[in-house]
Curated annotation (Swiss-Prot):
Annotated EC: 3.13.1.4
Record field: transmembrane: none
Known catalytic reactions: 3-sulfinopropanoyl-CoA + H2O = propanoyl-CoA + sulfite + H(+)
Gene name in the database record: acd
Name of protein: 3-sulfinopropanoyl-CoA desulfinase
Annotated residues for binding of substrate: Y244, N245
Organism whose genome encodes this protein: Variovorax paradoxus
UniProt similarity note: Belongs to the acyl-CoA dehydrogenase family.
Note on how the cofactor is bound: Binds 1 FAD per subunit.
Binding positions (FAD): 121-124, 130, 153-156, 273, 340, 344, 367-371, 388
Cofactors named for this entry: FAD
One of the GO biological process terms: fatty acid beta-oxidation using acyl-CoA dehydrogenase
Subunit structure: Homotrimer or homotetramer.
Amino acid sequence: MYDLTSAQLDLQARARELAQTKFAPTAAQTDQTEEYPWKNVELLRDAGFMGMTLPKSIGGQGLSYLDAVIVVEEMAKACATMGRITVEANMGAIGAIAKYGTPEQLKIAADLVLAGDKPAICISEPNAGSAASEMTTRADRQGDHYIINGEKYWITGGGVSKVHLIFARVLEDGVDQGIGGFICVRDGENSPAGLVIGRRLYAMGVRGIPETHIEFHDLKVHKSMLVVPPGGLKRGFASLMTAYNAQRVGAGTVALGIAQGAFEEGLERLKTRHQFGRPIAEFQGLQWMAADMSTQLEAARLLLRHAAASGEEFPDIDKAARAKIFAAETANKVTNDALQFWGSSGYGRENPMERHVRDARMFTIAGGTAQILRTQVAGKLLGMKLPQTRDGFAKVAAR
């Protein structure tokens, strides 16, 4: 259904060459040190794989989300951290800014992304994860500025990202106007007064990107940096969720890439490992496991590419949800089954299989849990709304 064009095959080949020669050899080190791979990010930037979905008029390549997932899969297959960075530099916050921001806002963000920045999107809070609309971070209008107070949780890239897209409840004269989004820029190690990078949350997998708390203490943001105004059907929180569909497809593709890499490594082990005096590939039970894994991976790939190509500006919300559910759960199963081909040696830290299992585990949680996405899909099928409460402002006012 999605035979790649000659241009896409060339794009895939270039991505694979970079990923396998530069990122795969350092993937274990990135996992062990848990340090942000600055040198690899520079290589990614120099190859033109950051900001590639941005319009040509501002320095991007004008590539589609389908093009982007082709690249993301290759990066994630080599190194999960580089796969996630590729998503965030092409399919995350930058997509929302490109769609809803002013030309001036887009230039600020695009220039930094094209220079190698991975934007951070600040949504989740300690008590507002899947129920994101219950966020209590507030932005009070004071003249030409908004004063932001609150905290965010599990922010990918906290401490390394320059561009931050911060979502908060907007208050005008003390009245809740709904959720809006603001651009705030960190300059290297220097944060604007009031933006505090909190403690790092050490993760089970995909360890090369820091996940942190971020706190806002009277952070002052000019009104010109309000990129997603609150209220209205196509504004505020609704706009965010539409733009977020691309990030979900990207996250699912990272899971796919991790699983594809694990499968290929497991398949080689299946061919070369001997037990009971013969190759274990001769055992029908393992043959069927391999056949199922291959089928599941191909199905996930087709769902993700179908979702990436859907929609006029962003992937269709339901197609994105279905694709991410299936890809993430497939990745968890395939990585575990691939480890099984290795036996006890696959469980050891010197073997990449245990890293693949840990990396894949993230994706049934991050970017929308498998359960909340199922609720979303079911809600559309049954004509029901998500079970989100509407008392977010009551919590804000009580702070």
